[in-house]
Amino acid sequence: MINLIEIRRQLHQIPEIGLEEYETQKYLLAIIQELTQNKPFIQVRTWQTGILVYLAGSQSQKTIGWRTDIDGLPIEELTDLPYASKNGRMHACGHDIHMTVALGLLEKMSESQPRDNLLFLFQPAEENEAGGKLMYDARAFENWLPDEFYGLHVRPDLKVGDIATNQHTLFAGTCEVELSFIGTGGHAAFPHTANDALVAAAYFITQVQTIVSRNVDPLASAVVTFGKMEAGTTNNIIAERAFLHGTIRSLTQEVNELTQKRLRELANGIAQSFNMEIELKLKQGGYLPVENHPKLAKELMEFFKKETKANLIDIAPAMTGEDFGYLLSKIPGVMFWLGIDSDAPLHSQKMNPDEHVLNFSVDTISQFLQFKVNRLSEGEKTIN
């Protein structure tokens, strides 16, 4: 039986940026090989730094998918733990927990051949390149494409034992925004001979907030945030360029597209009024809203509601983004939050999950997967 805490701590020490998860993939493959050897019903494929593990069913009618992400973040860890992430990278979003749970589930589910097919996806590049979309568009699944897809994300403000989801939208769709205003530089004493890009950018920052307050239905939800602005070189030189980096988030794709449209119109209008050029890049890619399939979500919620170890929470949507939304736009499925009881939030340099979540997750979620792939009646358990 694999040691979940040891695996999680080893994975935690080797975080890698999306599509560069070479050491992570090597480590995962070694454990996967150990778990699946001498089991002819299991096959393994790789796609770039991703891994697909397929358990062929004995009487297959469909394929159930379980997805985990494997990449880390460019953050320096400040927990002072002996197994802290290294080299200016950190598993600050809990993907080390996600991977460890997936390996534990694979161990449980590979003990005997399931009736239906079961696919484990170890997906790269969730944080930066929408790896799920990349794999889907590259046809990496081939004939292993699931009929239903499931996945989880850790949540620090929930307790170990909490499983939280809903029957509609769980996560927002996100769109990255990069915008540059291009004017004419000059001496601060002669502003009339220059064209100040910083002033135009500041004007845009204030005007762009009217999209949410005046263009989006008050009963809908959207966020437009610019967290980065770069302009100028010193105090007495008028800035020739001003660069803005921000994000759009919404709970529906319709609102996201409306917000993108209005942002583009505002940027062009302000550029025209200041007689400037702009460079605008809107990057949404695979970060669509995470839309749970109502029927499948109801089934999952009813299952965990009856699970004595779990505390099922019907939770409101969150403005966090997840590229699992793209896969769920192609394949019906469900994502849920998993409580890890950390004082520090996701993407924090001090995020430190309670490792008791590992055994709880594997024991509880494996029962759900058994229920799905072996077509058990509700409440029926398998003996592992």
Curated annotation (Swiss-Prot):
Annotated pathway = Amino-acid biosynthesis; L-lysine biosynthesis via DAP pathway; LL-2,6-diaminopimelate from (S)-tetrahydrodipicolinate (acetylase route): step 3/3
Enumerate the catalysed reactions: N-acetyl-(2S,6S)-2,6-diaminopimelate + H2O = (2S,6S)-2,6-diaminopimelate + acetate
Catalytic class of the enzyme: hydrolase
Q: Which residues form the signal peptide?
A: none
Catalytic residues? D69, E127 (proton acceptor)
According to the UniProt entry, its GO molecular function terms are: N-acetyldiaminopimelate deacetylase activity
E.C. no = 3.5.1.47
Which keywords fit this entry according to its UniProt record? Answer: Amino-acid biosynthesis, Diaminopimelate biosynthesis, Hydrolase, Lysine biosynthesis
Q: What does this protein do?
A: Catalyzes the conversion of N-acetyl-diaminopimelate to diaminopimelate and acetate.
Record-stated family: Belongs to the peptidase M20A family. N-acetyldiaminopimelate deacetylase subfamily.
What is the recorded name of this protein?
Answer: N-acetyldiaminopimelate deacetylase
Per the UniProt record, the source organism is: Lactococcus lactis subsp. lactis (strain IL1403) (Streptococcus lactis)
